[in-house]
From Swiss-Prot:
Species whose genome carries this gene: Escherichia coli (strain K12)
Top-level class of the enzyme under EC nomenclature: transferase
An annotated Gene Ontology molecular function: alpha-1,4-glucan glucosyltransferase (ADP-glucose donor) activity
Catalytic activity: [(1->4)-alpha-D-glucosyl](n) + ADP-alpha-D-glucose = [(1->4)-alpha-D-glucosyl](n+1) + ADP + H(+)
UniProt pathway: Glycan biosynthesis; glycogen biosynthesis
GO biological process: DNA damage response; glycogen biosynthetic process
SUPFAM superfamilies membership: UDP-Glycosyltransferase/glycogen phosphorylase (SSF53756)
Protein name (record): Glycogen synthase
Length: 477
């Protein structure tokens, strides 16, 4: 079984979000599972530099200009690169300029990505062609459409990592992207009078996956579907929509081997976690005290992530004696709010604006509770890292958060399945109730330790996801 992942980023070469973590780990897990998985990426500068052994496979003149297809390896995974400097050789973000304006030629930059993905199934590399083209998010959404236009030389899977990003472009660009105008149709890639790369993926793929079972259900409902609910309900009825939970890359996220921690530990040596907490308290300017629970946030600061609720609930958390360490960037109003809280409560609130991968490991190793109060969360990796590190996740019941964290209710504690704290409603009162439950559990150290060990024993390895995808691919054949 030969599978080509078509996507726009891959950890650690280039990362703007969780999509990169998935592509950085899933193909390697699939190879270990017996699937010949390769990845197709645009040759953005950081990616091009990282694939040092890239060789020319093919050269083509396309609707988006001249391209060179390269092939190399990274961490044992075969990588195809679309080398088109006029489209991809730009500093900074792959999606927008330094003023945060989307590049005006994004329609061509990402149509080309989909087109090359489909051409791979028609022999663009004469020595390897995929049985399945697996496209990820809107950037690769046209790959299933180009395959459909080509007579479907391969099966296609489209994975929704976040339905909120739709890749919308003016209709006149149909003239530029070499797809039949007949595709510009409500039964096709047209959405609200525009081209939707996301809808192209949803409509033309043989199968759609979402990154958790709950999110796969949620996106058939109007409040989560951004206008796509009709199509997604239809795909659900046809048995062509399912959820496959993301995994954790255990080579990178494991407290036993994590070199970024001051003190490594396992579920049997959890007392060694205390040194990480001490170091984190020092680094964040917090009072060094192992008796108080340290809550943490590692997140983009947006309302989707529910961080406004944390600000609102913060006085209640601090009154009970807790501490907060926050690492993140985003909405300027939220940034200011958290910085003001750090100034108002020195020693209790520590804030670092920005994102540092290394420091996120130190927070995960040192905190007692990781807060993930998202309004919606397709899968979420942060809570999975928390479980792995014995840093109990406090989450809202939505998307992948609902699939991965079990509340410390009395019955869950009795059944030995409790792994964190879960609240229902997207408001500060509901969040504070969950924070209160965390304090109650914290006051019973042996029970807290029991739940930590429970959480750390859970299996969210990529091997589980790789097996699910393999079974899906074989069903499509």
């Amino acid at each position: 079984m030969q599978v080509l992942h078509v996507c726009s980023e891959m950890f650690p070469l280039l990362k703007t979000g969780g999509l990169a973590d998935v592509i950085g780990a899933l193909p390697a897990a699939q190879i270990a599972d017996g699937v010949d998985a390769r990845v197709l990426l645009p040759a953005f500068p950081d990616i091009r530099r990282g694939v040092t052994d890239a060789q020319v496979v093919s050269r083509r003149d396309t609707f988006a200009g001249h391209i060179t297809l390269l092939f190399g390896h990274y961490n044992g995974v075969g990588i195809y690169l679309i080398d088109a400097p006029h489209l991809y050789d730009r500093p900074g973000s792959p999606y927008h300029d330094t003023n945060l304006f989307a590049y005006t030629d994004n329609v061509l930059r990402f149509a080309l990505l989909g087109w090359v993905g489909a051409e791979m199934a028609s022999g663009l590399d004469p020595f390897w062609r995929p049985d399945v083209v697996h496209a990820h998010d809107w950037h690769a959404g046209l790959a299933p459409a180009y395959l459909a236009a080509r007579g479907r030389p391969a099966k296609s899977v489209f994975t929704v990592h976040n339905l909120a990003y739709q890749g919308m472009f003016y209709a006149h660009h149909m003239n530029d992207i070499q797809l039949p105008w007949s595709f510009f149709n409500i039964h096709g890639l047209e959405f609200n009078g525009q081209i939707s790369f996301l809808k192209a993926g949803l409509y033309y793929a043989d199968h759609i996956t979402a990154v958790s079972p709950t999110y796969a259900r949620e996106i058939t409902e109007p409040q989560f579907a951004y206008g796509m609910e009709g199509l997604l309900q239809q795909r659900h009825r046809e048995g062509r929509l399912s959820g496959v939970l993301n995994g954790v890359d255990e080579k990178i996220w494991s407290p036993e081997t994590d070199l970024l921690l001051a003190s490594r530990y396992t579920r049997d040596t959890l007392e060694d976690k205390a040194e990480n907490k001490r170091q984190l308290q020092i680094a964040m300017g917090l009072k060094v005290d192992d008796k108080v629970p340290l809550f943490a946030v590692v997140s983009r600061l947006t309302s989707q992530k529910g961080l406004d609720l944390v600000l609102e609930a913060l006085p209640g958390l601090l009154e009970q004696g807790g501490q907060l360490a926050l690492l993140g960037a985003g909405d300027p109003v939220l940034q200011e709010g958290f910085l003001a809280a750090a100034a108002e409560y020195p020693g209790q609130v520590g804030v670092q604006i920005g994102y540092h991968e290394a420091f996120s490991h130190r927070i995960m190793g040192g905190a007692d509770v990781i807060l993930v109060p998202s309004r919606f969360e397709p899968c979420g990796l942060t809570q999975l890292y928390g479980l792995k590190y014995g840093t109990l996740p406090l989450v809202r019941r939505t998307g992948g958060l609902a699939d991965t964290v079990s509340d410390c209710s009395l019955e869950n504690l009795a059944d030995g399945v409790a792994s964190g704290f879960v609240f229902e409603d997207s408001n500060a009162w509901s969040l504070l109730r969950a924070i209160r439950r965390a304090f109650v559990l914290w006051s019973r150290p042996s029970l807290w330790r029991f739940v930590q060990r429970q959480a750390m024993a859970m299996d969210f390895s990529w091997q589980v996801a790789a097996k699910s995808y393999r079974e899906l691919y074989y069903r499509l054949k």
